[in-house]
C-alpha cells in the first residue's frame, strides 16, 4: 500500500493535470513532516513547480513554517525561469537547424511539455532530437560553431570505424546550461535488453507530425509512434533503475490530447509484438486510479487482451524511483541485475548481473574510462579500478543493491517483461514494422 503522503502527492499531481478548481482533499490534515516528505517526492520526480502551483495558495500551505514555504517557492520559481529560458533557446536552435536543411524529429521534452495546462511547470533537463545519420555532420558542426561542448565520448556500436556516425551524442552549452541529446537511433543497438525496439521506429521519418510550440512549428513523431515511444522509453528506464511518475503523466497527457488521433489497433499490436501489453495496461491503470485519466473521455481504446490490472507494486516502485530511477545508490547499482535478467532471462540473474556490472563490454569501459579509450593497453587497469571500487563500497551498500535488484526482477516477471523459454523473438512478426494505412 502507498502511504498517506504519497496518496496526497498523487492527488496534487492529478489536480495539476486536470486543472481542478478546489484544492485536493487529500492534503488536509497532513503533518509538517508529511509536507516535507511530499515536497521531497515532488523534487525527486521533477514536479516541484507543478506541486507548488496547486498547493501554494491553500490554507494548509500557509500554515507551514516560513522557511519551508520560502524554500519551496524559490526552488519552484527558479525551475520555471530556467525552463522558460531553455525553451526559448531550443526553439532558436531548432529553427537554425531547419535553415540548414535538417529536419529533426523532436521527442519527449518540449513536445510533452506542450501537452500540459502550464507547460513550463513540467521541466525537462534536455531536449532529444532524432536525426537522419546523413545529417549528423551538419548538426555537429552547427553546435560546435555555437559554442556547445560534446558531453561524452561518442556512443558507437561495437565494430564501428573512424568516421562512422554515433548513435547518440550529447551537447551542453557551458554558458547557458542548455543540453541536447542527438540520436541517429532511438535505442542503443548494443543493448540486447532493448536494442530490438529500434525496429518499431524504422520508418518514422516517412510520416512525421507537426506541433505548434509558442507559434513555431516543429516536427515530431506521429502520434501513435510517439505514444509507443514514450512507453518504450519508460520500459528502458524501468529496466535500468526505474521510471518516475512524470513519465506516466506524459503518457496520460499524450492520450488526453491525441486520444482520438491515435491508431489504437496499431498501438496495441505494437505492444503485443514487443511484449509490453501487460506493462502498458498497468501504467494506464495508475493513470485511471490516481491521475484522473479516462479511456472514455480521451477517446482511447482498451487493449483487446483481457488482463486484470494489478498496478500497486508497480506504483510503489515508481514512487520510490524518482525521475529516472536514481533515488538511491542501491537502486542505481541494481540496474545491472535487472538488465541482465531482461537480456538473458537467466535464473541466476544476481550473479550474472554483478559480473556484468564488474566486467562490462570494452566499448562501455572506453566511454566510462577515457584513458582506456586513449590507450587501449590500459583497459585491464580500468577493469581493476572498477572492481576495486565495487569492493570498496562496503557490505551494506552491496547488499542493498542486490536486494533492490532481486526485488525488481520479480516485478519484471510480474508484468511480463522478462524473457521466458516460450518467448519468440520480439518484433519478428513484421520485422518490427507495421505499415500505416495509406
Task: Give short role names for the model-derived ranges.
Residues 1-125, 131-438:
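Conserved NTP-donor binding/palm subdomain of two-metal-ion nucleotidyltransferases/polymerases, i.e.
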Amino acid at each position: 500500500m502507498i502511504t498517506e503522503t504519497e496518496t496526497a502527492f498523487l492527488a496534487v499531481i492529478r489536480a495539476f493535470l486536470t486543472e481542478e478548481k478546489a484544492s485536493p482533499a487529500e492534503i488536509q490534515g497532513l503533518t509538517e513532516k508529511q509536507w516535507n516528505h511530499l515536497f521531497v517526492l515532488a523534487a525527486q520526480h521533477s514536479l516541484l513547480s507543478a506541486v507548488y502551483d496547486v498547493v501554494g495558495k491553500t490554507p494548509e500551505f500557509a500554515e507551514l513554517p516560513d522557511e519551508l514555504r520560502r524554500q519551496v517557492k524559490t526552488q519552484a520559481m527558479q525551475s520555471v525561469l530556467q525552463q522558460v529560458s531553455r525553451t526559448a533557446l531550443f526553439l532558436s536552435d531548432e529553427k537554425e537547424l531547419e535553415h540548414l536543411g535538417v529536419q529533426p524529429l523532436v521527442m519527449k521534452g518540449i513536445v510533452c511539455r506542450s501537452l500540459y495546462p502550464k507547460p513550463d511547470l513540467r521541466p525537462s533537463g534536455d531536449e532529444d532530437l532524432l536525426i537522419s545519420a546523413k545529417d549528423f555532420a551538419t548538426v555537429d558542426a552547427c553546435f560546435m560553431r555555437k559554442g556547445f561542448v560534446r558531453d561524452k565520448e561518442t556512443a558507437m556500436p561495437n565494430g564501428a570505424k573512424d568516421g562512422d556516425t554515433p548513435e547518440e551524442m550529447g551537447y551542453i552549452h557551458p554558458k547557458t546550461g542548455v543540453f541536447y541529446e542527438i540520436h541517429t537511433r532511438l535505442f542503443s543497438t548494443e543493448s540486447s535488453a532493448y536494442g530490438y525496439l529500434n525496429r518499431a521506429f524504422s520508418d518514422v521519418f516517412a510520416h512525421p507530425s507537426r506541433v505548434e510550440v509558442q507559434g513555431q512549428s516543429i516536427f515530431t513523431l506521429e502520434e501513435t509512434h510517439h505514444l509507443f515511444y514514450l512507453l518504450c522509453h519508460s520500459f528502458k528506464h524501468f529496466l535500468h533503475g526505474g521510471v518516475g511518475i512524470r513519465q506516466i503523466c506524459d503518457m496520460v497527457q499524450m492520450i488526453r490530447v491525441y486520444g482520438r488521433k491515435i491508431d489504437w489497433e496499431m498501438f496495441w499490436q505494437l505492444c503485443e509484438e514487443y511484449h509490453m501489453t501487460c506493462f502498458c495496461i498497468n501504467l494506464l491503470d495508475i493513470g485511471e486510479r490516481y491521475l484522473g485519466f479516462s479511456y472514455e473521455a480521451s477517446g482511447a481504446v482498451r487493449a483487446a487482451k483481457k488482463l486484470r490490472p494489478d498496478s500497486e507494486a508497480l506504483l510503489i516502485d515508481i514512487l520510490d524511483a524518482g525521475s529516472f530511477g536514481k533515488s538511491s545508490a542501491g537502486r542505481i547499482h541494481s540496474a545491472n541485475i535487472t538488465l541482465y535478467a531482461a537480456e538473458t532471462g537467466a535464473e541466476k540473474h544476481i550473479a550474472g548481473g554483478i559480473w556484468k556490472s564488474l566486467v562490462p563490454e570494452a566499448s562501455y569501459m572506453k566511454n566510462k574510462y577515457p584513458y582506456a579509450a586513449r590507450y587501449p593497453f590500459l583497459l585491464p587497469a580500468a577493469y581493476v579500478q572498477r572492481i576495486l571500487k565495487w569492493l570498496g563500497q562496503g557490505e551494506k551498500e552491496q547488499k542493498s543493491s542486490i536486494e533492490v535488484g532481486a526485488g525488481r526482477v520479480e516485478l519484471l516477471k510480474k508484468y511480463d517483461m522478462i524473457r521466458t523459454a516460450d518467448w519468440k523473438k520480439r518484433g519478428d512478426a513484421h520485422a518490427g514494422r507495421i505499415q500505416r494505412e495509406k
